Amino acid sequence: MTKSKSYNEIYDNESFYDLEQAIDIVKKASSAKFDESVDLAISLNVDPRHAEENIRISTSLPNGTGKKVVLLVLAQGDKVQEALDAGADYCGNKDYLDKIKSGWVDVDKIIATPDMMPELGKLGKILGPKGLMPNPKSGTVTMDVAKAVSEQKAGMVELRVEKTGIVHTVCGKISFESKDLIENIKQIYNTILKSRPPSVKGQFLEKMSISSSMGPGVKVNINSIG
């Protein structure tokens, strides 16, 4: 039996499903031999070329992402120990800037204190394409490094609109209980709704689909999310 045929027996890819149904389908369609991530694709009625509509926000998921987040904090003085005490995997300044210049980027997130940004900004060509450049909007440029580390480790996700007007984000793992995925998705949904720019006319959040890493996208009836 082909994968597409087995998927077709589980759901109709043209239909919209209530959130709980959609999650159930994603779980049934998952056949990978590892704990797949569960991903959301959210289509917004925005034009990211306009600064006001270029949405970039963060939120903490109540049940985490299920992923171990490897963090680098770029800081100086007592902020180095503060970050390490909070759980940062790596922390330093010039030594790590030099490592990044040499091509080392074996981390999931970088947090930086504001004083590190002038030097870090010079590495934009390395960090930018990988989505690793710290940004105040996402809470990764801050003096409160302990809080930032704790939030990232607990399951902070960045919600950033792409050129196509779509936000892609992880919302958990296939092994999560359905209720935990629902709570995470509602948190993402409500956070995005609150970020609606005043310039947007008509419906803001247009479409949503949910999938596992290796599975098909299932369309969600956004009216079923409250």
Enumerate the predicted regions with their spans.
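Long, charge-patterned amphipathic alpha-helical coiled-coil/hairpin "stalk" segments used as oligomerization
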Residues: 88-193
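Flexible glycine-/small-residue-rich
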Residues: 42-44, 75, 114, 171-173, ...
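Translation machinery proteins
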Residues: 19-81
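Structural signal for hydrophobic packing residues in well-ordered secondary-structure cores
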Residues: 11, 15, 23-34, 48, ...
